[in-house]
Amino acid sequence: MVAVTELGYLGLTVTNLDAWRSYAAEVAGMEIVDEGEGDRLYLRMDQWHHRIVLHASDSDDLAYLGWRVADPVEFDAMVAKLTAAGISLTVASEAEARERRVLGLAKLADPGGNPTEIFYGPQVDTHKPFHPGRPMYGKFVTGSEGIGHCILRQDDVPAAAAFYGLLGLRGSVEYHLQLPNGMVAQPYFMHCNERQHSVAFGLGPMEKRINHLMFEYTDLDDLGLAHDIVRARKIDVALQLGKHANDQALTFYCANPSGWLWEFGWGARKAPSQQEYYTRDIFGHGNEAAGYGMDIPLG
C-alpha cells in the first residue's frame, strides 16, 4: 500500500528575513543558504539542498509542508489514491518542481486548509557538507525520520486523522490532559516512520496554521547550548525544559521571529508499535510565556 515516508520540508512565510537569518543560524544552528533571489532564504539541516524555505511576505505562517514518497511509481500511485478518494489536487509543472528542488510534486490541502505537497526525489547536495550556523557538538536528527514534527490547526480532528491515514500515517490520541475549565484536551499524534510522530493536531482553536515545529539534536550538549542562547537573548519560552511522556524527548519550546513556536529537542524514542496514552509528562514543561497556544498542563 502506497504511503508517505517522511515529513521532508516546510515552507514558511515571514515578515522579517533578517531576524530569521539570525535566529535559525545563531540560535538553532541551521545553515543559511542565500542564492541571491532576494525574496527567500533556505535553511539546511543535513545534506539536502534545504529542509525549510523562508519566503519574504507580509504575513507569518506556514506556507506549505512536503510529504515524501519513495519514487515516481509511488508518486503516481499516491496521486491516483487521493484522486479516487475525492481529494482535489494538482500535479505541479516541471518548473514548480524545480523551484521546490524535487523531481515530482503534487499540491493539495488537508482538511484544515493547510497547503500540503506530495513529492519525490529531493535534491541532495552530497558535495556540500553541512556547515552549522553556530558551533555544534553533533548534528540534527533527519535522514529517514525527516525534518521533525509539527502541530497543525485542524477544526475537524476525525477528518484530519482520516486524511493523514490515507497518506499512510498511523496514530491516535496520546494524551488526556485535564484543563482548568473542566474539559479534557486529547491531542492526536501520527507517524509514518521511526520518528515517534511527524504530525499532531487537536489542541483546539489556533490563530495560525501551525502551532510549533519540533526538531531534534543528536547530542544533548547542543540542546543545552541552544537553551543557554535562548535564555541569554531573553527569547520567550512557552514551555520550560521537560521530558515528554509520549516520545520521551527532552525539549523546550520558545518563540521564533514569526510569533509561533519552535520546539528544541533531544533523545526521542522511536515510534511504538502499539497505542498508549498519558495524563501528564514525565517532568518539567512548566508554562512560562503565555499566548503561544501551549498553555496546557503538561507537568
Curated annotation (Swiss-Prot):
Q: Which reaction does it catalyse?
A: biphenyl-2,3-diol + O2 = 2-hydroxy-6-oxo-6-phenylhexa-2,4-dienoate + H(+)
| Gene3D superfamilies assigned | 2,3-Dihydroxybiphenyl 1,2-Dioxygenase, domain 1 (3.10.180.10)
Asked if Repeat is a keyword of the record, the answer is yes
Q: In which pathway does it act?
A: Xenobiotic degradation; biphenyl degradation; 2-hydroxy-2,4-pentadienoate and benzoate from biphenyl: step 3/4
Fetch the InterPro entries from UniProt: DiOHbiphenyl_dOase, Glyas_Bleomycin-R_OHBP_Dase, Glyas_Fos-R_dOase_dom, VOC, Xdiol_ring_cleave_dOase_1/2
Which keywords accompany this UniProt record?
Aromatic hydrocarbons catabolism, Dioxygenase, Iron, Metal-binding, Oxidoreductase, Repeat
Taxonomically, which superkingdom? Bacteria
Q: Which GO terms describe its biological process?
A: xenobiotic catabolic process
Q: Which enzyme class?
A: oxidoreductase
- E.C. numbers: 1.13.11.39
Residues holding Fe cation: 149, 212, 263
Q: Name one GO molecular function term.
A: ferrous iron binding
Q: Give every VOC domain span.
A: 6-121, 146-267
Which cofactors, by name?
Fe(2+)
- Please report which protein family the annotation says this sequence is part of: Belongs to the extradiol ring-cleavage dioxygenase family.
Query: What is the annotated quaternary arrangement, including any partners?
Result: Homooctamer.
- Kindly provide the name given to this protein in its UniProt entry: Biphenyl-2,3-diol 1,2-dioxygenase
What gene is this protein translated from?
A: bphC
